[in-house]
């Protein structure tokens, strides 16, 4: 029984799920390569600490915190991450997108 409980706790920790005052959310990378260059645990943490989505976006792109090393367009610069709020069926989603060029974006993670 203790082994099952410990395994469950490890799985919950690794999946970057966090509990926030009775609210639960999960940060899901678009693919495994993204999670190598984007600290999903830090993303979940600052999402929980942010006052609103604007504050969350500002914190994601703060040079001092170094949450992201994404350079998806290979221009030698770390890509700016924008935060989009959307609804899909009955789900409220927060989508994190890398800005690659003018009017060119790539989804990198979703917060469910």
Set out the residue ranges of the language-model regions.
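Bacterial Sec-dependent N-terminal signal peptides
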Residues: 1-25
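N-terminal low-complexity segments enriched in Gly/Pro/Tyr/Ser
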Residues: 20-112
């Amino acid at each position: 029984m203790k082994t099952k409980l410990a395994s469950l706790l490890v799985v919950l920790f690794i999946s970057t799920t966090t509990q926030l005052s009775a609210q639960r959310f999960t940060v899901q990378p678009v693919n495994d390569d993204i999670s190598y260059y984007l600290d999903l645990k830090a993303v979940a943490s600052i999402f929980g600490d942010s006052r609103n989505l604007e504050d969350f976006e500002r914190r994601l792109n703060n040079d001092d915190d170094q949450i992201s090393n994404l350079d998806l367009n290979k221009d030698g610069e770390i890509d700016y991450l924008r935060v989009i709020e959307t609804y899909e069926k009955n789900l409220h989603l927060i989508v994190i997108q890398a800005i690659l060029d003018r009017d060119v974006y790539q989804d990198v993670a979703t917060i469910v």
